[in-house]
Regions:
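Structural cue for short, hydrophobic secondary-structure segments
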Residues: 31-34, 58
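Active-site glycine-rich loops that stabilize anionic/oxyanionic intermediates
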Residues: 26, 33-37
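Conserved alpha/beta-hydrolase
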Residues: 48-66
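Alpha/beta-hydrolase active-site loop
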Residues: 41, 48, 71-107, 111, ...
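Domain-level recognition of soluble alpha/beta enzyme cores
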Residues: 1-29
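The feature captures the conserved acid-bearing segment of alpha/beta-hydrolase catalytic domains
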Residues: 20-23, 145-179
Length: 179
């Protein structure tokens, strides 16, 4: 996790490789890193899942990578939203004329979250924030976290039914109510 140390990852993925063609659509896996982190941190897992027939996408979360790390407050608010944005974006690529047109089974999406990525995942699976955290010292201003609280109607109405599975790795979860 030291951004000053260079690492070389040797894997099986190929840049600009054509997607595999199959008779059925492939499930989607979204990989969400910790705070700070980057899209490469779980690349061996992503490659392994892709080799087993999953469409895998890994996120660089804005304001939360080694290169652009900001205060963690923005991460609390944005992490669950980032994950849903990526799922929506993959749906667009899956639509007619998109790069992955008709290849993704969008109704069978899984999210792998490491640390703060697990935090977003748990929130997206129904683990709403505790009301006490909305106005706590570490929360973003203007009560932005209120829309992630389990008792908020926006939160309950916004849960994404496409997410059928989750794998939270050492999830940051002190702020959840429904665990």
């Amino acid at each position: 996790r030291n951004p000053q140390i260079t690492a070389t990852l040797i894997g099986q993925a190929l840049r600009e490789a054509a997607p595999a063609q199959g008779e059925e659509n492939f499930p989607l896996i979204v990989i969400s890193h910790g705070y700070p982190g980057n899209r490469y941190l779980l690349s061996p897992l992503g490659e392994n899942l892709a080799s087993k027939g999953y469409v895998v996408v890994s996120i660089d979360h804005k304001d939360s990578t080694y290169e652009d790390q900001q205060h963690i407050k923005s991460t609390f608010y944005n992490r669950p939203l980032d994950q849903r944005f990526i799922i929506d974006s993959m749906g667009e690529l899956n639509s007619t004329g998109g790069f992955l047109s008709g290849m993704i089974d969008m109704d069978n999406t899984g999210v792998v979250g490491y640390s703060m990525g697990g935090f977003g995942l748990v929130n997206n699976l129904g683990g709403g924030f505790n009301e006490a955290v909305v106005n706590s010292f570490g929360a973003p201003p203007q009560g932005l976290l209120a829309q992630h609280v389990s008792t908020d109607s926006r939160y309950r109405g916004g849960l994404d039914g496409r997410i059928k599975a989750g794998f939270a790795i050492v999830s940051f979860s002190q702020t959840f109510r429904n665990l």
